[in-house]
Regions:
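Positively charged n-region of N-terminal signal peptides that target proteins for export
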Residues: 1-5
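C-terminal partner/receptor-binding element of secreted or periplasmic proteins
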Residues: 124-158
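Solvent-exposed loop and beta-edge segments used for protein-protein assembly and interaction
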Residues: 32-34, 47-49, 82, 125-127, ...
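Bacterial N-terminal signal peptides
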Residues: 7-15
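Mature extracytoplasmic domains of secretory-pathway proteins
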Residues: 49-118
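N-terminal export/targeting and maturation segments
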Residues: 19-64
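A structural detector for beta-sheet-dominated domains
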Residues: 41-43, 56-58, 72, 91, ...
Length: 158
């Protein structure tokens, strides 16, 4: 009798932990008017503590090929009440700013991906939950996976 009490909770835990990732999407509301929801399901890695995900939000813009440009705005993280999941939100993209290097007016414009300004936005790598980002219509969400090893190096005293 005692054994069955022990096995039942383990069985229940195993059933709950194998719920498909699609079921987790129920926690994330649909995008509001003027916004688009982007979803990334990460593949499982052997040691996910050694990886990070960089979220990159921007837009394709036809501009000169010389100056450096960026959009104002920021990625915010919000906790979803009752679920404990995090969603990421960019409320507005822009205005665009950049350097003012003189450009030949006859120089043809090129299509470039212009991102939000500021530091890279890194989040924990977690293949068990989707990464969900809400952005204004017309914006694009890209990502990079950053990996390292478990080795570390000592710094010299100085």
């Amino acid at each position: 009798m005692k054994v069955s009490h022990c096995i039942m909770p383990l069985w229940l835990f195993a059933a709950v932990s194998t719920v498909p990732a699609q079921d987790n999407m129920k926690a994330f509301p649909p995008a509001e008017a003027g916004m688009v929801r982007h979803v990334l399901q990460l593949p499982k890695q052997e040691d996910e503590s050694l990886a990070k995900v960089e979220l990159i939000v921007g837009k394709q813009v036809k501009i000169d090929p010389i100056n450096t440009y960026f959009f104002s705005g920021q990625i915010e993280s919000e906790n979803i009440e009752g679920w404990g999941f995090t969603r990421y939100l960019v409320k507005q993209l822009g205005p665009m700013a950049g350097t003012l290097i003189g450009v030949d007016p006859d120089e043809p414009k090129v299509l470039r991906f212009i991102t939000l300004g500021g530091e890279p936005f890194l989040i924990r790598y977690n293949s068990r939950l989707p990464v969900v980002v809400y952005v204004p219509e017309g914006a694009e969400v890209r990502f990079r996976i950053w990996n390292t090893t478990s080795e570390s190096s000592s710094m010299k005293k100085g």
